[in-house]
Amino acid sequence: PIFVVNWFRMNEQGKFAWPGFGDNARVLKWIIDRVEGRVVGEKSILGTMPKYEEIDWSGLDFTKEEFAGVTNLDKQIWLGELAGVKEWFEKMGAKLPARLAAIRDDLEAKFNKA
């Protein structure tokens, strides 16, 4: 499995949405638990994402609403990101593995249907 995390996502107030560096271990623990079958997550357009209750929140006041904010998949933002990836891929020309272009195209189609 491949896991993707955006530690630098900003909230509406222009501050980092995720609490900080030391709390990254909470997500890394979830990744290990997922690989080892101790958690199942929930399906999303991008794959499997953690459920709020699967993260160890001990010692941190991080609400379900805040978690929903950091795991939200905004269609327009993602379509913009994928457009940028397409431009970058086009610069690679024939050197780009076809599978990467196919994955990008598949994600774009999924977001367009959402």
Annotate the PLM regions:
Residues 1-114:
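Flexible, glycine-rich loop/tail regions that form catalytic "lids" or insertion modules at the edges
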